[in-house]
Amino acid sequence: KLFSTGIIDIGLYPYGNAVESQEGDKWVFQCQHGEAECQNNLIEACVLHMLSHPSQFMPFIYCLEQNPSLSNAMTCASKLKIEWAPISNCYNGTQGNHLMHELALETNALNPPHQFVPWIVANGQHTEEIQSSAQSDLLQFVCQTYTGVKPDVCQSTSQKRCYKN
């Protein structure tokens, strides 16, 4: 519901605490939790590049994160009727490597630098308050942060109690 309102522009950066190095014309990534994490980051980078709207990519990311593996990525794509071949081509080719490098540059350019993941930035800022609020109730955080006319979906977040008549 929130994505269709236009009050949120969400970006996911599946890079985490990885480190990159260059070997020839290729980038090599070492992920904090090993090769499987790097594999899933690469799959997610390709999916995010190919599916531009959160209503398209969020169901895939959610599905993949339930069981992060290449075989589950293919299953998720099938379940969600997403063509696997372009993702596979990206994943296995130079495009995926380039996308991961771009994610590294964006992650490393964060100010302040990220200290953990997930690292939440709202309106170009990161604070502990933003982090805590967004992680505990993203809908409420977005609705409270948005300065324009609040959409209907935000009205339900303002009521914490419902008293008897």
Locations of the language-model features?
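Structural alpha/beta surface segment adjacent to cysteine/selenocysteine redox centers
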Residues: 1-88, 156-165
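C-terminal cap of thioredoxin/glutaredoxin-like
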Residues: 63, 67-165
